[in-house]
Design a protein with these regions (language model features):
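Transmembrane alpha-helical interface segments in multi-pass membrane proteins
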Residues: 1, 8-12, 255-320
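Hydrophobic, regular-secondary-structure patches
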Residues: 13-92, 99, 117, 134-135, ...
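Extracytoplasmic
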Residues: 30-34, 49, 54-57, 67, ...
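Structural beta->alpha junctions
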Residues: 41-53, 83-89, 159-164, 189, ...
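Alpha-helical membrane-protein architecture signal
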Residues: 55, 236-239, 243-246, 282, ...
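Mid-to-C-terminal secondary-structure elements
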Residues: 98-114, 123-226
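Peri-transmembrane interface segments
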Residues: 213, 225-258
Length: 320
């Protein structure tokens, strides 16, 4: 029981701490000092799903009118089947600007970013993630190749460095990034912007920046003082702290459950020692007869119990 209990406690606590660290790393991969602004209310059934989407001009207004900001990236998304080299792959197609790479801590593995002319003109060019490259191009060079998103043929101008799994279990590398004008004009046929990604300066007051963004967007969306916000501003740092706190609580709960095995093991040792005392009555009587003190006999059995527990704990540590 002690072996199993000790091993279970160590394993559960280690797994919990590992999960906490993984969550922190994945949240940090979303971007440093990052705010995500999305349409819809933060709380409540439906979450404001009918709220008006943003416009690209909203991102420009935030970037120019609010201090403490490094970059603002408008983001539009669409799922689509991507075709290249006779292979098909369903992926997430993202429309944005070069600021999207900065806000998300993305690095270029090969190739280049979008040029200003390509962004203005909505050129048929794209950057792809590692998963899309692997599924569509295999071992061949993807940079300079053509791929088709729906009916639009795009030239691959860059390959993004791999980031792996995201904080919510999604594959961050399974994506195609193109200029937002290209996505809106040629893929979705509308000017909706799903998310505004705001990267703040180091040391910026996230609370103040959030309040300034909220006030600016309320004015731009013409909300009355009595109207609730039809958008929400999420601080990824706070999200990371919340998720880390949740995983820590789960770690403690798992450790407590595993500790029950230790309790059961302790009860088992107690029962064994009781049986041992019964079977060794003659030995105890002989020791008392030749002058041993009662506390010395008790100490002997206590040492035996501690030795059994320690041995079981050591074996449990080794097994864990």
């Amino acid at each position: 029981g002690i072996v199993i209990g000790g091993s279970a406690v160590i394993t559960m606590v280690t797994l919990g701490n590992g999960a906490t660290l993984a969550v922190q790393n994945q949240i940090s991969s979303l971007g440093t000092n990052l705010l995500q602004v999305r349409p819809g209310q933060r709380m409540g059934p439906g979450g404001g799903g009918g709220a008006a989407a943003f416009k690209e001009s909203d991102a420009e207004a935030i970037a120019t009118q609010i201090g403490g900001i490094v970059a603002v990236a408008p983001e539009a998304r669409s799922g689509a089947t991507v075709v290249a080299n006779g292979r098909n792959w369903t992926s997430s197609v993202i429309g944005s600007t070069n600021a999207w790479l900065l806000t998300g801590n993305w690095k270029l593995g090969q190739g280049r970013e979008f040029s200003d002319d390509e962004l203005r003109a909505g050129a048929a060019v794209c950057l792809i993630g590692e998963t899309v490259r692997r599924e569509l191009f295999g071992t061949t060079d993807a940079v300079g190749a053509q791929l088709r998103v729906k009916q639009v043929s795009c030239t691959v101008i860059g390959l993004l460095a791999s980031k792996g799994q995201g904080a919510f279990g999604n594959d961050q590398d399974d994506m195609v990034l193109m200029p937002i004008q290209t996505l809106q004009r040629r893929i979705t046929g509308n000017t909706r912007v799903n998310t505004l990604l705001v990267s703040m300066n180091d040391g910026a007051d996230a609370t103040r920046v959030t309040a300034d963004i909220t006030q600016l967007l309320r004015e731009r969306r013409k909300l009355a003082e009595t109207d609730e916000d039809n958008f929400n501003v999420l601080d990824t740092k706070q999200l990371g702290e919340t998720l880390s706190g949740t995983t820590r609580i789960m770690t403690m709960l798992l450790g407590a459950v595993a500790a029950v095995s230790l309790l059961v093991g302790g009860i088992g040792i107690m029962n064994i020692m009781l049986v041992s005392v019964t079977e060794r009555t003659r030995e105890i009587g002989l020791r008392l007869a030749i002058g041993a003190l009662e506390r010395e006999v008790l100490l002997q059995f206590l040492i035996e119990a501690v030795a059994l527990s320690a041995l079981g704990g050591l074996v449990g540590i080794v097994l864990a």
